Amino acid sequence: MFLSERVKEPSRIPLSNESEEAVGGSAENANTVDDEDAKTEVSNDRIDNENNTATASSGAVHNEYTSIDAEGPEKEPLATHGLSMELISDISTSKEVQKHLEKTEPETTSTSKYSIQSDTSSKSDSSPNSGTAPKRASSLKPGLDSDSTLKADSSPKSASEAKTTIRFVPIGSTPRINPLVFTISSNQTVSILIKFLAKKLKTKDHVYLYIQNSFQPTPDEKLSDLYNLFRTNNELIVSYCESVAFG
């Protein structure tokens, strides 16, 4: 009997004052932790509500931009024609740059072209811009038109190019030749005139020549020397006959 009663009644150990205070303090700490957990849950709920509000506002903004795009004109799809997207972007960029350059290009080019065309159209103008230099006065000969221009002689003609005009005059009954005026090279001698007259007169006899109707030149004299000394009206007068006429 005594053993059963001891088992049924639990043994109680008396607690000191310090242990009781510790137990009470732990209970208070537990209550404080519970309050902080509750506050944390409330703050988390507020954060979730704010996130939901921000999401809703962003959705509204997105819907607003979507509606604007929907109201605008539809963009036509870019025809790729088998080209890569990188190449297409490069082509579009180059076209934009070219358009920008065309807009920013100065207008001086068109004006300069117009001025050049207007200058070349006026042929009568003798200004340097007309493209035609004025004719030199030295290239024009008095008494000639402006179209019949002659090149200025930069160097004197050589003896082989110089010409001498000879006028033949028959003496007495000597036959007349036609024409009477001839042009011959100045470096020739009198002998060529004798041969020429003998051929024209068809005579085997000797032909005699006279200058100024006064003296007979030697066959080896140059015509240029005789012309410079005895010319008359830019001609050398040579008289001829088939017999001795003077002296």
From Swiss-Prot:
Residue ranges of the TM segments: none
Main location group: membrane
Segments for region (Disordered): 1-158
Cysteine disulfide links: none
Membrane topology: Peripheral membrane protein
SUPFAM superfamilies recorded: Ubiquitin-like
One GO cellular component term: autophagosome membrane
Pfam families assigned: APG12 (PF04110)
Compositionally biased tracts (Basic and acidic residues): 1-11, 39-49, 96-106
Biased composition (Polar residues): 50-66, 146-158
Compartment(s) where it occurs, according to its Swiss-Prot or TrEMBL record: Preautophagosomal structure membrane
Biological process terms in GO annotation: autophagosome assembly; autophagosome maturation; autophagy of mitochondrion; glycophagy; piecemeal microautophagy of the nucleus; protein transport
A molecular function GO annotation: Atg8-family ligase activity
Stored InterPro entries: Atg12, Ubiquitin-like_domsf
Keywords of the record: Autophagy, Isopeptide bond, Membrane, Protein transport, Transport, Ubl conjugation pathway
Gene3D superfamilies: Phosphatidylinositol 3-kinase Catalytic Subunit, Chain A, domain 1
Stretches with biased composition (Low complexity): 107-130
Cross-link Glycyl lysine isopeptide (Gly-Lys) (interchain with K-144 in ATG5) placement: 247
Physiological role: Ubiquitin-like protein involved in cytoplasm to vacuole transport (Cvt), autophagy vesicles formation, mitophagy, and nucleophagy. Conjugation with ATG5 through a ubiquitin-like conjugating system involving also ATG7 as an E1-like activating enzyme and ATG10 as an E2-like conjugating enzyme, is essential for its function. The ATG12-ATG5 conjugate functions as an E3-like enzyme which is required for lipidation of ATG8 and ATG8 association to the vesicle membranes. ATG12-ATG5 rearranges the association to the vesicle membranes.
Subunit (UniProt): Forms a conjugate with ATG5.
Family: Belongs to the ATG12 family.
Protein's UniProt name: Ubiquitin-like protein ATG12
Species for this entry: Scheffersomyces stipitis (strain ATCC 58785 / CBS 6054 / NBRC 10063 / NRRL Y-11545) (Yeast)
Gene field: ATG12
